[in-house]
Amino acid sequence: SQFSFSHLRISKAFREPLLLPLNCHTKYILFSDCHRGVGNANDNFLKNEYLYLASLDYYYRNGFTYLELGDGYELWENRSVRKIKEMHLQSFKAISRYYTAGRAYSVYGNHDIVKRKSRFPRTHFHTCYYDETLTECLFCPDITFYSGIILKDQLQQKDIYLLHGHQADLLNSTLWPLSRFLVRYIWRPLEKLGIPDPTSAAKNNRRKKKSEERR
């Protein structure tokens, strides 16, 4: 059944998860589906970036650990990671601040599923920007992008399982290359006309309900 296959895909995401402690002293801030783009009309993150930066500064100063649960980068509509980094330089600097402090971890989603390739972090995330002296600065060297994170409850053994969630949907998991093609060449142009992407559970209530029922 579809439910059984969804369960298998979700279980697979937790075969080699990142394990983090959960107790009365740990503090986590969770972000998902930022979909950082290249600054064009389809960049849904752009208008919220100031709020994002303000919240990251607040949570950093208060000792939180940053968890990004997938689709941080819109790599279905856009091909260039470099352009995304250039457009949202301040956001990347803020994340780098957490990472340098050992307080940033990331899960890949369907729209940035290419991050699961081992060479991808080395190519795109080792360095990020140039400072005022034109010296290239480190971003997140040796970063790992996980399929899932488990917060291990050290008090009541009630662990919290974190993943992006696309594993529950066949079109956005196993058939993601097809979905990317449809988004990049069909739904992206139509979105500019105000027509929502039907492959997205976030923009399609019927798909959203079905995905939630499978989890």
What are these model-predicted stretches?
Residues 110, 155, 164-167:
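Short, flexible active-site-adjacent loop segments at beta-strand->alpha-helix junctions, enriched
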Residues 1-27:
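Acidic, histidine-bearing metal-coordination/catalytic regions of metal-dependent phosphoesterases
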Residues 26, 158-160:
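Alpha/beta-hydrolase fold active-site loops
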Residues 160-215:
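Active-site-proximal loop/helix segment associated with metal-binding centers of metalloenzymes
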